[in-house]
Amino acid sequence: MLVKVFGSAIHGVSAQTITIEVNVDQGVGYHLVGLPDNAIKESSHRISAALKNVGHKLPGKKITINMAPADLRKEGSAYDLSIAIGILAASDKILAENLDQYIIMGELSLDGGLQPIKGVLPIAIKAREEGFKGIILPKQNTQEAAIVNNLDVYGVENIKEVIDFFNGERDLEKTEIDTRKEFQNKINEFPYDFSEVKGQETAKRAMEVAAAGGHNIILVGPPGSGKTMLAKRVPSILPPLTMKEALETTKIHSVAGKMGSNTSLMTVRPFRSPHHTISDVALVGGGAYPQPGEISLAHNGVLFLDELPEFKRAVLEVMRQPLEDREVTISRAKFSVNYPSSFMLVASMNPSPSGYFPDDPNNTSSQTEMQRYMNKLSGPLLDRIDIHIEVQKVEFEQLAEKRKGESSIEIRNRVLKAREIQAKRYKDLDINYNAQMGPKEIEKYCDLDSTCQQLIKNAMEKLNLSARAYDRILKVARTIADLDDAENISPAHISEAIQYRSLDRDFWRA
């Protein structure tokens, strides 16, 4: 008897429906075709043990399983449940009449229990798009799938529940959540606040400008000056995630298996801080079966690279293209996948190998060591970082000050006003904030008077800045003007923007 069951495969951050055809006929053997990986090929052992432990067994006949489309690689153990149900239906142990209404996914344990799977949100979205009535999943994944409206989501703990459901002997409980309520309740929850930062007013201002325009920023300062403390508080001043951004972000983390059990929707911007020993594949994504890297996990949020020169230069260089294009393409011989990577880069570094230049009384870093240290960061990479700011060590008087600094909410309100101005400006364009401006937008929205032009010309000549750095100055100046609610860029805005570029040559060529 031939039976069709439906599952789903992940491709990038999207899903594709898989038709699992199971035929049980006279003969012996277990044949699995349709480009499955080793984990799927091993499923026969898990399925056999699981069925035996819930009172069923594999039929003593020839079992042929085809996973279509045959040219799409299928991977992982998430097809265990759908294959097992198909085998039982083809053996007349399950009524097959309603199988075509559901996507069925789940990894089987040997006792018949179900383990959580990855990529549930894109699977649920695809199921709704293709008109399926519902989706049957491990119970740990149901909160995530229930984000999708107009789709019945059933969570099960073992395969026996699924067998009884299709035989009409049990009703499964639907999982329902109020997505909007869930989103609004957690949208302003942050573990860190800028009011906890003592001193560092200049650095705080630079962080505000960076957040307002979506600019990348690098903090240069000695150990203990508060670089990491400042970076961890950036998400608290960024605009709240929109529902569209929350769904995008959740899909990426779902595909990567980074969603916790019983987690539904990511409601705050991600903050990713990989160690400096990370490989280029782990950073940008890839592998034999491509997975999102850290830059995609930071999509719509912050990627913090602490001690930037300690990262391998090759690792940093592969980040150049995603920084510019805000997406990363991973190509293989037979396919390619795109992962979004629109993130705000926050990097930090010491000014020298010793960490204390130019205030090191013993001058423990030689000129050669300094040059080698700075050469780890290429000019093209630095040009893609809009704001370079020096973070000074905090004096005792500032640390002892009991009065709290400005809160994240106050800073965020100014950032939101600037973002609203940008949203109106770019409402007819495919960009959202100033950092995304291209040459045409810069020419149109960053018009300078003669005083501003002379000011920036002098800075370019004195600091030997590149054409890309010139564009960065204009973008940052536009953001500063937006924070001031000014229609035109003034010399004061240009001066402040230049101040955020001056470190790149003073320090890099120390």
What are these regions (language model features)?
Residues 300, 306-307, 318:
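Walker B catalytic acidic pair
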Residues 219-260, 325:
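Walker A/P-loop
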Residues 221, 285, 307:
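The Walker A (P-loop) glycine that initiates the GxxxxGKT/S ATP-binding motif of P-loop NTPases
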Residues 1-218, 222-228, 266, 331, ...:
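Peripheral, non-AAA+ core regions of ATP-driven protein-machinery
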Residues 18-24, 283, 386-389:
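Short beta-strand elements
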Residues 170-209, 213, 240-295:
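P-loop NTPase nucleotide-binding/switch module
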Residues 33, 39-44, 59, 66-76, ...:
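Basic, amphipathic alpha-helical bundle interface domains used for macromolecular binding and assembly
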